UniProtKB/Swiss-Prot annotation:
Residue numbers binding NAD(+): 13-14, 111, 169, 300
CDD domains (alphabetical): GAPDH_II_C, GAPDH_II_N
Chemical reaction(s) catalysed: D-glyceraldehyde 3-phosphate + phosphate + NADP(+) = (2R)-3-phospho-glyceroyl phosphate + NADPH + H(+); D-glyceraldehyde 3-phosphate + phosphate + NAD(+) = (2R)-3-phospho-glyceroyl phosphate + NADH + H(+)
UniProt signal peptide: none
Keywords, alphabetical: Cytoplasm, Glycolysis, NAD, NADP, Oxidoreductase
Name by which UniProt lists this protein: Glyceraldehyde-3-phosphate dehydrogenase
Biological process, per Gene Ontology: glycolytic process; lysine biosynthetic process via diaminopimelate
Quaternary state and interactors: Homotetramer.
Cited HAMAP family: G3P_dehdrog_arch
Covalent S-S links between cysteines: none
GO MF annotation, one: 4-hydroxy-tetrahydrodipicolinate reductase
Binding residues annotated for D-glyceraldehyde 3-phosphate, in chain numbering: 140-142, 171, 195-196
Amino acid sequence: MVKAKIAVNGYGTIGKRVADAVQAQDDMEIIGVSKTKPNYEAAVAHQKGYDLFAPASNSGAFEKAGIPLAGTIEEMVEKADLVVDCTPGGIGEANKPMYEKAGVKAIWQGGEDHELAGFSFNAASNYEGALGRDLVRVVSCNTTGLCRVIYPIDRELGVKKVRVTLARRATDPNDIKKGPINAIVPDPIKLPSHHGPDIKSVLPHINITTAALKIPTTLMHLHTVNMEVNTDCTAEDINRIFSSQSRIRFMSQGINSTAEIIELARDMGRPRNDMWENCIWPESITVHEREFYFFQAIHQESIVVPETVDAIRAMMELESDGAKSIQKTNKAIGL
Ligand SMILES: NC(=O)C1=CN([C@@H]2O[C@H](COP(=O)(O)OP(=O)(O)OC[C@H]3O[C@@H](n4cnc5c(N)ncnc54)[C@H](OP(=O)(O)O)[C@@H]3O)[C@@H](O)[C@H]2O)C=CC1
Ligand SMILES: O=C(OP(=O)(O)O)[C@H](O)COP(=O)(O)O
């Protein structure tokens, strides 16, 4: 089988995970990854066997650091069928003309606006809509986690209203530049947070608003989700619907915090402690009339990674059935 040629522009928190997940599939392969700085991440990418590309103006720095380059970012893009842009939020927009000039398909992550790609993706919610598309945005980690729970509930019970409060991890574990250290920060103060409108970019008919707070932790986000539905239901019904979703995992056996979830991922031998699934506490599912609540934790560094693989498969038309793609992606990465 000829594999789809995938480039990762921006080998950071998301990019390095996307590269490994793509490489684990049998219908796509990584032809290159990019960095701007010749630091430890660039050295490890080279050690792993990835061809490394950088802006032409930075090639001297890589040479000085003894990290070999395979070429410039433009040259990497020319070799690819599809580029996954994992540059920091707001940077990826400037790369669109480069992708258009090279005639390659492109995926952006949730730090970019919906309008840049014109299609926002979540595998369970709208896989088929991405079939054959040239430009797609995979929605952000929190938005992905919310789509994964709202879509199946809407399909089975009809969602009337969703209200969510998100406690957002302040920054990623490797990031030493950002805070907060001793504060809780409304993020943003002006409501709603971007997540509600972003859900509507995937599921336009859902009545949803969201509020988010940044808290001094790096491990995971935590959501308090409140949904009103159109159909009578019990906690067992909600439990059954969530159980049918392969990217939802129930937390039990003494797991009462995000710290223990990450320890579970370590104990399971997951790469980089990644927890690709929404982590829901079934005990928290509480129904009153047609309204219910629950808690879920979201591992921000990894949740969008299987979704990105599915987006590639849809855009390259390697699989027309979303459920089959989800199954294939999960199996290859060990989910
Ligand atoms: N981190 C998270 O929790 C999540 C992030 N996202 C989204 O994913 C995207 C990427 O975020 P994240 O992985 O955290 O970002 P990181 O800062 O961890 O990584 C960004 C990468 O892009 C590279 N880079 C920076 N500038 C350029 C450039 N001009 N051209 C090419 N490469 C560049 C950096 O390389 P170098 O260091 O060499 O400069 C780095 O490897 C954003 O849209 C973000 O919103 C989505 C879900 C979760
Ligand atoms: O996609 C994310 O969060 P989001 O879903 O709240 O936008 C990631 O955790 C990145 O968030 P950041 O913009 O705080 O680095």
